[in-house]
Amino acid sequence: MRSWLSAIALLTLASPLALAQMPGVTINKQPAIFAKRTFDPARPPADMPPPTPGEDAECDSDFLSDANVGGQARQTDATHATVKISQIKVTLQLNITIWTPVKVTQHVIEHEEGHSQISEYYYQSADKLAQQIAANYMGKQVVITGTDLRGELSMLLQKMGADITDEYNKELHVEQTQLRYDAVTNHSRNEVAARDAVAQSLKEIPPGSALH
């Protein structure tokens, strides 16, 4: 099983030093996208990620986050301005692809579906996590300096968007639960049912409880 965390920070420029269109935090959680693909182990496709050591199949979970930060700047002189963050929009996405060899047992398929279920479970509360993180940035005031205040403003908001998505990625902690699931099932090599292993792993390491 492999989880990917991708972050993109976007910036929308409006009139001079005024970047907010509507105040507040907006979280846009897109529906999860699922796909199942088969492959020939002797000739795996180029776009298939390498399987996790110990497994012949793969569940590839890609958590995407995109933060757009807006603020209002009050220029105090030619080279100084105070920026107040007044708008944050975070878009979340989860893409899951299960890769299985052409000849695979139902037990292995169920194991990979268990990985998918864990990712889906974490994604259920991902909007709440993103909301909490973004709320900490709302209302922040930062002084920018330089001869190109618009450029400084652009860099500030891009960095803040990147900081939000980085924090979201770090706080998800889904990988630790997935690793526990693999330990419980011995990478599908024992007879523990996937549904039982999923329940045990989520009970032992639920969202928000994993260690840093």
Question: Which residues fall in each region the model found?
Answer:
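Catalytic Zn2+-binding segment of zinc metalloproteases
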Residues: 113-131
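Alpha-helical segments in soluble extracytoplasmic regions
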Residues: 85-101, 132
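N-terminal signal peptide c-region/cleavage motif recognized by signal peptidases
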Residues: 14-15
